[in-house]
């Protein structure tokens, strides 16, 4: 019998209680009454949408700031709080959770596109247990059903209040945290090694694009036409991928474009640039590009734009966003076609070494993540206590 099984037999042999969120805590809103200027001249830190979306444990060492007046009634984020994203382009990406698992040393706030849950009694859950539990399959299925919408989905707090989660005894929580944190530690080690390799790749890529005045520079609008995406909900299921800002969302029976294209984010994940060389559809949170391949290799544009910090071209605060007019003004080098081909061939090889999930470090990380998810969902499935 494992240590966890022994603890379950000792502390909850008849199962565990499941409680609705409304009985466990109180929801609170993120920042209110803020405009663009408040985010451009900040005096206090805030937790961004992407911070919540991307991290099981909330990152507090952030550079995002907002101006908050001395007497303003804004909700501060505290240790043990659970933060949720309030909207996304698909129900599956709504209500993503992030838990404050370390002490908060200074006032820090939550962006207006997210909301928080503060427990009435913080002694009944370990924050590190909640970070795993709320990302587990059983709870995520419930959270996804709280979203309403057509082209963009918003979380319903009344529905969120009815979501139920297990409440195992603390010794059981501690053992589950120990096991799952060990898995995450192994993943982190591999990710750190991959980060180091990617830094080498990025440095070499930077050197390849260090043209200076030796080549002609053009605006992005001079080498491609940026086009909007649109809704796909009325289409049937098919073989053509539908791209959102985070990548492939689903597959449909028609396509918007069938030539090589670089997909650029309009909202959401601004670091997600995609290269597509097969027919595809894209939603309105992503732009696609039409490129004259007799003058410019689409993959060359893709590799170069990976060196551009698109966040600098974004609106400030809230959900990150880009416009056609801003993207059109990005300067891009335009060497001869043979030189473009040479650079693309080199960078494709490096990209495969760093990102190919069928081999190397990326494959190891993908395998570890699947292993973690398997054990997480297995360990977090409890027998319900009768009554």
How does the language model describe each region?
Residues 8-31, 210-242, 364, 375:
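Non-catalytic DNA-recognition/assembly elements of restriction-modification systems
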């Amino acid at each position: 019998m494992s240590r966890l099984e022994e603890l379950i037999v000792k502390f909850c042999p008849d199962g565990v209680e499941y409680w609705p969120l409304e009985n466990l805590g109180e929801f609170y809103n993120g920042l209110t009454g803020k405009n663009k200027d408040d985010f451009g001249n900040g005096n206090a830190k805030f937790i961004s949408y992407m911070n919540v979306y991307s991290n099981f444990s909330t990152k507090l060492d952030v550079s995002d700031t907002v101006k908050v007046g001395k007497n303003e009634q804004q909700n501060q984020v505290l240790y043990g709080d659970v933060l949720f994203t309030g909207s996304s382009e698909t129900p599956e990406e709504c209500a993503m959770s992030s838990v404050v698992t370390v002490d908060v040393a200074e006032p820090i706030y939550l962006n207006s596109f997210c909301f928080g849950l503060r427990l009435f009694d913080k002694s009944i859950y370990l924050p590190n247990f909640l970070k795993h539990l709320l990302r587990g399959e059983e709870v995520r299925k419930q959270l996804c059903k709280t979203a309403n919408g057509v082209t963009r989905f918003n979380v319903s707090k009344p529905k969120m209040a009815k979501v139920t989660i297990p409440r195992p005894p603390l010794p059981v929580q501690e053992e589950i945290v120990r096991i799952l944190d060990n898995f995450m530690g192994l993943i982190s080690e591999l990710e750190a090694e991959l980060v180091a390799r990617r830094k080498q790749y990025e440095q070499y890529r930077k050197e390849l694009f260090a043209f200076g005045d030796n080549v002609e520079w053009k605006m992005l609008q001079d080498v491609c036409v940026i086009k909007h995406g649109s809704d796909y909900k009325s289409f049937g299921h098919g073989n053509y991928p539908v791209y959102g800002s985070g990548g492939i969302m689903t597959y449909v029976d028609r396509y918007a474009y069938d030539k090589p294209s670089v997909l650029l984010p309009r909202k959401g994940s601004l670091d997600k640039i995609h290269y597509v060389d097969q027919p595809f559809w894209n939603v309105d949170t992503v732009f696609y590009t039409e490129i004259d391949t007799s003058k410019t290799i689409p993959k060359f544009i893709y590799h170069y734009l990976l060196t551009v910090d698109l966040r600098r071209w974004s609106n400030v605060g809230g959900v990150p966003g880009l416009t056609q007019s801003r993207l059109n003004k990005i300067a891009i080098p335009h060497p001869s076609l043979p030189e473009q081909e040479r650079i693309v061939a080199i960078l494709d090889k490096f990209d495969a070494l760093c990102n190919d999930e069928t081999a190397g470090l990326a494959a190891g990380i993908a395998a570890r993540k699947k292993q973690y998810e398997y054990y997480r969902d297995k360990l977090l499935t409890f027998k319900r206590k009768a009554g």
